Amino acid sequence: MPDQRTLLQVDGVTKVFPGVRALDNVTFSVLTGEVHGLVGENGAGKSTLMAVATGALVPEEGRVVIDGVEAVGDTEKARSLGLAIVRQEPALMPELTLAENLYLGVPEAERPSLMDLSGWAQRLLEQWSHGVAIDTGTRVLSLNPEERFIVEIVKALAAKPKVLVLDEPTEHLLAEDVERLFERIRRITASGCGVVYISHRIREVQKIANRLTVLRDGQGQGTYQAAGLSEHQIVELIVGRAMDREFPAKSADAASDIIFEVESLSGTGFSNVSLKLRKGEIVGLAGIDGNGQREFMRALTGLIHSRGRAMLNGRPVSLRSSRLCAQAGIVFLPGDRHSEGIFAGLSVRENFSIRSLGLDSMHGLVSRPSEARRTQLAIREYAVKTPSIETDVASLSGGNQQKLALASVLANKPKVILIDEPTQGVDVGARGEIYEVLREAARHGTAIIVVSSDAEEVAGLSDRVMIFSRGHIVKELHGDSVVESNITTAILTATAHRERGFDRVGRFWKWAAGDWAPILILAVIIFVLGLYASHVNESYLSARNLSGVLALVATLAIVSYGQQVLMLAGGIDLSVGPLMGLVVVILSFYLTDGAPVADQATGWTIVVVAAFAVGVLNWILVDPLGLHPMVATLATFMGLKAISLILRPMPGGLISESLTDGISTTVGFIPLAVIVATVAAVILEFVLYKAKLGLALRGVGSRREAARMAGIMPRRMLFTAHVSCSLLAAAAAIPLMAQVGTGDANTGENYTLAGIAAAVIGGASLFGGRGSFVGALLGALLLTQINVVTTFLNLDDAWQSVLLGAMILAAVTVYSTSRQKVVAG
């Protein structure tokens, strides 16, 4: 169109990593109203180019202009100028709800009031599809991959971008959602938005793109009109050579022996499935996601409990565990390469040998030369491109990671290979190599079962295809009928009667994984324990006893709030106990009877400054310097204890009695301190779930990098969390001071672990992103109650430790198990 203007211009960009020139003088542009396809093999530089465009990476040379404004190396500026990106791996925070992720994912100007968050999110989802059945209050961790990707797309569209980058947007989408995506792309481009469409699926690019740019080895290979190139020409531009055939010739013998057989196999997501597999045969499992084919495959490798009969080489084989299956010769290569297929952080050598260590070991000791020799042979045989066998596997391209994983699986010469999405996220050149590896394994007698969402891939690879619907095999294709059109037709015919997914989690576990479960569970336990104690000893419910219990609760509750703040951000602080002791020691010099007001003010000022300084020190050690939180705060623990002992080698310095009496004031039998602690818990709980600060804090703890992409500053949030933790610990020392009445360097030490325990029992996650201040308050009440109840029941001190340990173990078990059960694949 003559009035088109340039929305995104990347000029002469060069980006160099150690030993690699990822981008070499690349130029790329996106016009108003166009879809610009970006294609190339894995490692060609597509993701690096988009990282430069979005400001996530700073190039050595070149510039980025968004809607006429230069923006290099600034993600926030790129977002504010109207650039949004949908990444191949959704940048979502798993512990936050769907609605909260949408809220943080859009610019400030597009955000609603937090009070209308759920309704706003529901309206956005309905713009995607009126029939969408995703609860906006659902935590992202419990969404399946397709639902997570829909949320990521909806989030990007809600930002009303001028330029939308889509990176492999259809990998996890059902067919109907792919069509919805294309319809939305057409709609936003009609209104002037420019779209960058990155995909390995060349037919999709041809279908949706106006222009396309090809990258190869970090260099542009030209920009073309999409309609002017055939699929074959695009492939040749991508790989730099002619591609005669994508799929190797099929060679299965229909008369070969049956090697693997299952009869009437049933499990979660599938039922009464029977299948026979011959030597050297590749069988494809096809169907819309959620119809049981993946669950069936995982059951065959022992990852999902199943019922039925399985035979390998005519003998019964147990499918109870993946270990037993592997020992029998049944191996599995999962589709989620990053989570289950490779061991990120380990080398190429370790990733290859880890599945076949028996070939390199004797008497439990691994022979490094043997391991290295086998790895070198494997990377040559399977054409794995890697600088060395000691390279971190995470740095390899997706295709090379997949080839290495395949080589690792084949090293033990398995009888049956189960492979889920063999080429997902793999470039077109590596696909052909992977297909050849699978077919070559079949020629040597290995039986293979493949699950793929790509009907063309299933048709090209498979000798037979089983169509799944509603957890059953509803049709079998073999011989000349194994073609893409027949597979697609069979799938679409079957889906008219299919059920979308299966409910795998019981009601109790769903409830236990919620935010209110810890609070209700603790309330019931506290009530029952109190009822029992009062039945055994009537004086338990006396005003004097209850007042004493609640006074102790206030101190523990406030320090547990500090731990809770930090744990929400993914941290922990072992120094809070000695800090409380130091506060009491400092105040014992300034808050004595008859001390001038100026001296008292000086004491309070020193305490605030000291607590702030401790928080800053812990933050510096943990964040900028990168020490583990437990190591860093343990060092602070010892330093604070040393300072307290230097100041007060022996207990001394009586705190003003009038001051301690004031702090110990009660309303009826309820101490003022516990009233303050309760009000503080309610306020902090409100901030946690209804204020931007709480949302940002949980976001950082849930997934730091995703939070950063959403515009949150993780370093700033961690600074806030560390300082808040120390200040709350100092505040907790005030009621503690009233209880001990003198400066003692050992005061407060027990509150380090007790504060953590109260937060954990109250529902905090040790991994960050989740917690409750009301839960921490009840956790503090329960821990204090246990200590008191054992005394009233005439139990010795050992029972205190037993009961406390049992409570912590039970809480962690219930919360962790429930949260794991609701996590979707």
Describe each model-derived feature in a short phrase.
Residues 2-503, 511:
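Glycine-rich phosphate-binding loops of nucleotide-dependent enzymes
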Residues 453, 615, 729, 739-805:
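Transmembrane alpha-helical segments in multi-pass inner-membrane proteins
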